[in-house]
Structures are given as structure tokens and as C-alpha cells.
Amino acid sequence: MAAAHQLTRTTQLLLLCSLLWTQAPRPVMSSLLSAQTEDFIDWWQHAVFYQIYPRSFKDSNGDGIGDLQGVISKLPYLAETGITATWLSPIFQSPMVDFGYDVSDYKSIQTEYGTMADFEQLVNTATSLGIKIILDFVPNHTSDKHEWFIKSAARDPLYDNFYVWADGKLDNQGVRQPPNNWQSVFYGSAWQWHEQRGQYYLHQFAKEQPDLNFRNPAVVRAMDDVLLFWLNKGVAGFRIDALNHLFEDETLPDEPLSGKTTDPLSYDYTKHIYTKDLPEVLSMVQHWRQLLDDYTAKHSEGATRIMMTEAYADLQVLMDYYEDAGGVRGSQLPFNFHFITDVSGDSDARDFVYNIEKWLIYMPRGHTANWVMGNHDKPRVATRFGPASVDAMNMLLLTLPGVAVTYNGEELGMQDYDEISWEDTVDPPARIAGKLDYKKVSRDPERTPFQWSNATNAGFSTAAKTWLPVNPNYLVLNLEAQKQAVKSHYKVYKSLIELRKLPVLRRGRFSIEPLSRTVFAFKRTLKDYDTLVTIINVSAKEQLVNLTDFINRPQKLVVEVAGVDSVYAPGQTISSSALTLSAHEGLICKLLDA
């Protein structure tokens, strides 16, 4: 869990220069500025990936929990919006301690969500609508209810070393203690004593989520088998969860103190140099990439099978996931979380430009950028940046070069529901934190049910009680209302996806500048096509903008997309030298000769 931070302009420039200097062999400005000249762009390279959190998306049977039939019923909505790929948060069999991230059977569907027949129907329906399905794959750990763990705890020879087991140590009073000072991401020791086995097992997350031992070739083979099982079911790839936690130092040394906190049970108490981002992780990424490439080659009738990887890690680590120094390729899409972790509602225009340039400049040649604006683990866009910024942030997301990732509900500007009571709180870290502190860490606010309409439970479910409370603002903030409105966040989002079909946004050159501390702009240019300019005001005040220097000469602009509160309208002609942007406004324009 990376903490958001702000950098001074001087620090940013020094870091950017450092990145360029230390990575001299990498293409610097070419990946940032040059047009993509290839005739072929693979299906995923310009896709909008729409993350569905199934438990909160749509309930089809009235039990208060979203399910696969609910997802199937809403696939036409995704197709109508223009979505061509969706990744589903975990749907595998699970005790639901961490709501699917504690898997008890990788080859079965969670009973609450449906059956394997439902999943097969989902894939077939999605395929008929031109939508590809990506599954969330959780390899770092299983549930403690998984058959593998039960057999490992019993020292079954075939599963004895499937997990990370270790003896404890005795303190001066002869009391048994964990092997070292490693902490769980969810708070507390990362070690849990198992009475039957007579050893501790490692759990980097909840104690019900024991870590698998990827140094055991049998574990790797078992996970390969899981991937092949779902590939044969027709999925187009996987999003790999918590990737950088896969390996730990075998000698189990104490981790050095970070100095960030005096609480020895806090995850921030130590520097995680022995439990995260070990070199072996990269080898596993490359192994899985080869598996996917081999599968694609053997099944030429299907599209490229891809890997998306989740890791809150240093930039160099993420770039190596793309391709290492020896040219070995890994993840097609190492998730770029900079819009989540490195900018906020307090950021100025230079912060945004810096974080965009940093990824594009550092990315190895021949790879595809990606931009994740939100997910199920972090506050929503409307909460992080403010409701007035929703359209501008979606304009940013959908006109940058490469892949865009949208969390369900962001197209409406859904907001976190921060008033969930302690009694209704279900998120594991929040429950561990306790009644006084749960709101500081709970992920429940961003996971509330999708707001389809102003009907009971926002049209999500007919149940008397839903698994999480519905945000009360659904009465005014819902899809049905936004479809009927003259202007709405949803209509802006849909128009942006339509705009993305233009060759200039698929293959155009890219350049970006901060025009001031409060406004930045970028343009996409391609020979024989109109240039598009995206302008964003990140401040809470109206700004007068002169684009003349940025576009090299005075020109007229034609508005392509404007936000819901904008005074401008699509098709309107305006001057490049005297453009007024209201607070948090974004605008996309086409250039005309003066």
C-alpha cells in the first residue's frame, strides 16, 4: 500500500534528470513524442479496461450480493458505453474473509456468485458483444481452507513445502515468538502459529491467507495449471494480484526499521527489503508471460492473451516488469498507479505533468503505457480530487496514449460512502483496526453497490439488506438519471470513448506542458488528421488560458468534449488565445487554421 506523497518542483526535476541519466540506453524522448507508426495495434493496446467488483455490481437473485448473472445482465450496458474489455475482481471459491482474495479452490466459482455454467455464459455473451474477459488471479496466497494448506499443515509429502513454514524462537523468558519481525500488510505479525503442524506459517495479508512457497517447483506447476484451466474457458488474460509479494528471503532475516512509526505491529515499522520486490518476482513474471505467449501461439484463432500486474513498487521495478535489461519481456501492462498514489486534489499542474512524463520517458521502447485512475482499494476519483474534477480526470485518462483502466462507477462520478457504521463494516484491515480507527483504513467506502437508478438499493438489489450499505446519494447520482440528463458525467465518459476511436488518439504523437501552476495541456498530432488538445485546470479557481505558445501560433479551436458544468459546448468555435476554464474544468478541442 503506497502512501500518497507530493514532491517539490526541484525534487521532481532532479529525479527526472536522474532517471534519464541512469537509464541512458532507454529511448528518452522517442517514446514520449513519436507517433506510433505500426499499422497493427493489438486489441489491448488502446483498450479501456473496465474493472468490475462483482460483489457490488448487480445482484440477480435478491440476496444482497452481486453475482455473475448480474454481470451478464449488464454486459449490454458496457457494450453501449464502448467498453471492449473488463477485468473481474476474484470470483473463485472463497470463505470471503478478504472477499475473494482468499481462494479455497482456484477452479470453482464462488457459490454466492453462481456456477461454472454461469461463467461460461458470461464469456460467451461478452464475446458476442465484443467484450474480452480478464480474471483477477491471486497467486501470492490461498485461503487457509484450501485443500493444499490443509494437507501442508498435516505434512502430506506432496504438499509439505507448498507454503512458507518456519520454526519460532524462544525469548529470554522461554516464551515462543515468531521467527522474525516481519509484519502483515493488514497489521500485526506476518506469522501465525499452527498447532497441528507445530510451526509458524507466513501470511503477508490476513492470517487466513497463508503465503504460497514459490520456491517450490510444484507450486509453480500448480499455478500454471490454474492459468491454463481458465484460458481454456475463454478468458483473454489475467490481472495478477499482489505480485511483488511472491518471494521472501529464505534466511528470514529481520527487516530494518523504517523510522516512520514506533508501533512494531504496523506495516510501516520496517523497510520491506526481504519480503517485497525480490529479483525472483521478475523471473516469475517472465515465466507467466511465456506461458501466455505459448498459449496464444497454439490457439491462433484467439486474440493475444495478456497479463496485467498489480504492484505498488518503485518505477524501476515496474519498468523491468515490461522488459528487463536483457530484453526479456514480462507483463504487457504493469499497472501505473501514479494518478492514485502520486497526485491528489492538492497537486498542481506540474505534479500531473511530471508523473505523466516520468512514465512515458522511462518506459522501454516498444511497450504500451497504461493509466489507472481508480480501483477497489483506494478512494474514488470524486473523493480524491473532488466531484467537480470527475470530467477532467476522465478526459485525462481517456486521451493519454495507451491503455485506460476505469473502476466501475467512475464513469458516473460515484463517491465514497464514508459514513458506513462500525456494525456494517466488513473490510479485514478495518475490522483489525477497531471501532475507533476503522475509518482510517477501511476500503468499504469505495466498494459500495453500483448506483443504477433511484429505485430501492439504487437498483442494485431487491434485498432488504445489501452486503454493504448503498450510498444515500444514489437518489440523485445514478446511471438512469445521467442517461436522461441533457449533460452528465456518463455522457461525457461515453463521448470520450467514442473520441478514442480517432486515429490521432490511437497513434498520434504526444506532447505535454504545464502552462502555469494551475493549468496543463497536451496535444495529440498525426499527419493528415486534426490535432486534438486536452486542457485541464486543476485549481479551485477560474483560469484564463492562452494556448498560443503551446500550439505555436494563434488558432481557432473547435470544442470536441466539454464537462457538465462547462460554458462551452461541443462544436463551438473558440479562440486559442483567450480561453476561460472554470474551477477543475477540462476541455478537449480540435485545432483549426486561424
UniProtKB/Swiss-Prot annotation:
Active-site residue numbers: D241, E310
Annotated signal sequence range: 1-30
Keywords: Glycoprotein, Glycosidase, Hydrolase, Signal
The keyword Transcription belongs to this UniProt entry's keyword annotation: no
Glycosylation sites: N140, N454, N537, N546
Top enzyme category: hydrolase
Catalytic activity, as annotated: Hydrolysis of terminal, non-reducing (1->4)-linked alpha-D-glucose residues with release of alpha-D-glucose
Site keyed Transition state stabilizer: positions: D377
CDD domains: AmyAc_maltase
Gene3D superfamilies the UniProt entry points to: Glycosidases, Golgi alpha-mannosidase II, Oligo-1,6-glucosidase, Domain 2
GO biological processes: carbohydrate metabolic process
EC number: 3.2.1.20
GO terms of molecular function: alpha-1,4-glucosidase activity
Pfam families from the UniProt entry: Alpha-amylase
InterPro entries: Glyco_hydro_13_cat_dom (IPR006047), Glyco_hydro_b (IPR013780), Glycoside_hydrolase_SF (IPR017853), O16G_dom_2 (IPR045857)
Family: Belongs to the glycosyl hydrolase 13 family.
Name of the protein in question: Maltase 2
